[in-house]
Amino acid sequence: MNINANLVAEPIFSSFEKDGETVEVVNFVLVKKYGKGKEYINCAAYGEKVETAKDFEEGDLIHIFGYFKDREKDGKTYKNFIVKSYNKIEKKENKEEE
């Protein structure tokens, strides 16, 4: 699934141990606007994909590719987007030659 949306806040970087190895993770939230409505998308990227998010800033337009995964915690179901690949979409500046 491909989604283009804006970054709500600065990404959060952390790590955890799995099978005796440290796994890097970045979590971030995107907002996709639909007419008068909004959808917030909780995203997570792991391993070497973490590096890409270090240049992201609040408000950036981000393209993500991956899949949604439901997770249960404290009796609630959370929907997270697992990122397979992603990048910042650069804004095109109109340059007028004089």
Predicted regions and their residues:
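Single-stranded nucleic acid-binding surfaces, predominantly the OB-fold ssDNA-binding core
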Residues: 1-98
